[in-house]
Every structure is written in structure tokens, then in C-alpha cells.
């Protein structure tokens, strides 16, 4: 096996976010320009992309946020516990990891 540090790609960057949702909070419908890869630190969430079933992801589980599909549902279903997760995106330097849908 070989391992090398990836070379920097001009115009692109990788960002890591720690995101927190209070109990019962939900996100607005949005779109990801590039895929994201994440891991739930605490709590759980329910999520659905256009045309796909609702999934539930719990603490200790990983997930992928799909690019180019409307992310129609994202919520912390717990009335008592916060949700904390980390997610990484590799994006063009000028992009944000999501944009709200009208």
C-alpha cells in the first residue's frame, strides 16, 4: 500500500463543518453542488432527497449528501436531544456547500 498527501487543486478546497441542530429543528429545502461525506457525533436525523425514501441516521453512523438532487427533508426528530454531526465537502473555492431552494 502507498499513501500520499493529495496535491492541492487550484480553485478547489476541502471544508469540514461541525453542524448542530437543537431538538426538533429542521432545515429548509436546499441543494448541494458537490457531494458531502459526514458522521453523526450525537443524536440522530431524518433526511430525504427528491424521489427517495426518508432515512434515519444515528450517532456513530456515516452518511453521504448527494449532489444535484433537491434535499427536501432534514430534521432532528428528537424533542429532547440535540443533533451534532461533522460533514466534509470538496468545493470550488467560490462555492458554498448548499443553496436554498425557492
Predicted features by range, described:
Residues 8-11, 21, 50-70:
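Short acidic-glycine-tyrosine-enriched beta hairpin
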Residues 94-102:
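Short, low-complexity, Pro/Ser/Thr/Gly-rich segments in the mature regions of secreted, periplasmic
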Residues 33-52, 61:
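Glycine- and acidic-residue-biased ligand/ion/polar-headgroup-sensing regions
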Residues 54, 68-95:
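Ligand-binding loop in jelly-roll beta-barrel domains
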Residues 8-11, 31, 39, 56, ...:
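Extracellular/periplasmic catalytic domains that process cell-envelope and extracellular macromolecules
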Amino acid at each position: 500500500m502507498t499513501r500520499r498527501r493529495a496535491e492541492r487543486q487550484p480553485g478547489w478546497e476541502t471544508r469540514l463543518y461541525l453542524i448542530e441542530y437543537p431538538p426538533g429543528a429542521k432545515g429548509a429545502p436546499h441543494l448541494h453542488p458537490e457531494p458531502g461525506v459526514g458522521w453523526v457525533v450525537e443524536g440522530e436525523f431524518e433526511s430525504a432527497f427528491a424521489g427517495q425514501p426518508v432515512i434515519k441516521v444515528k450517532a456513530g453512523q456515516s452518511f453521504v449528501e448527494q449532489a444535484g438532487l433537491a434535499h427536501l427533508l432534514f430534521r432532528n426528530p428528537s424533542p429532547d436531544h440535540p443533533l451534532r454531526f461533522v460533514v466534509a465537502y470538496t468545493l470550488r473555492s467560490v462555492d458554498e456547500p448548499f443553496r436554498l431552494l425557492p
